[in-house]
Amino acid sequence: MKTRILRYFKHLGLTILVLLLILIPVGISEGAQVSYGHDSASLNFDGEGPYVFYKNDSLVTVKYIRGNKDDGFAIDEKDFSVNQPIPAEVYFPLDQTKFNFTIPTSFETPRSIYRDNKKILAISDIESGFKTFRDFLIRNKVIDENLNWTFGENHLVLLGDFVDRGFSTTQVLWLIFKLEQEAKKQGGTVHFILGNHELKNMYGDHQAASLKYTFVASMLGKTQSELYSKDAVLGRWLSSKNVIESINGTLFVHGGLHPEIAALNMSIPQINAFMRKTYYEAPYPKVDEDKKEFLISSKTGICWYRGYFKEDLSQEEVEKPIKKFKANAVVVGHTLHFSVKKFFEGKVYGIDVKHSSDYHKNWPDYDSEGLLITNGNYYRAMADGTLKKL
């Protein structure tokens, strides 16, 4: 009897081992990770902010969270005229990083097409990871150690999904906001192209947001949707952004370009204008569906489409929208890859990779990557600042 029991557990152990040997590589190939070693600093709310809301046409209210769970929390708030510079400070609890800037309260819609032959550095799907975003920019000489813009007249393309999942959404967005202003002063450009997760936060789908922001909104006396509404500075700023841009002959979109876009009688600026009207609407099928509706669909839309990697597209189908917009290639995020890669004979570049998390360790862990385009050549931009030609 004892021998039979031992034999049973031996077979069971071998079966489990074999399953693990099969499942672990499969899981890793799909981007699965095991998280451990969570840092409690993620729940440090002291100094969280700023959260800036329009009080009326002439005033905004700036709010910060102060305190801790032992002594309680309070809101530090102050009103400012929309006509004066609004000083702001952002705090990152993990390593006590702080940065300062001023907040304007009105925003211009960016251009959709750029031609200047300057360098382009693109990165996507940071998902609220402030540290990995900051460190990548420092090592690739976009900013200095004090988080100041050093990329001159060049282009930094942020290809969507910089929010959700992590604990540093506020810090990430304000760093982008700050760099956008600094780049402009030097003749450079920060292109924040919206992804599906920015849109989700705007139309009220917060399932992928960290639970932290449920409490943040409650402390501020707001709902989570109000953090990015048209009555919030971050909301108005996001709503000014594009979903597609052409920079020096390369297209940038978060999801991808469905082949049917080639049949639409719409330019890139017209697509952005149409999409901008829908940012605060969840995508849903309509009875009297306009043929432009597939642009916002959660399957075929510009911010959602995964067809380059999930469908059996021909080279001709892939190239139709690229040729329509007189471009050489399209760069996309949204669909995860082990590294920045080119597809379809160099017509598609996928740049969504796994990035390290701010407040917990992962196994396996991954280094960030981006895409550098210069002099017509495409390179993997590595986390340590080195380049690898594609």
Go through each PLM region and give its residues.
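Feature recognizes metal-dependent phosphohydrolase scaffolds
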Residues: 2-390
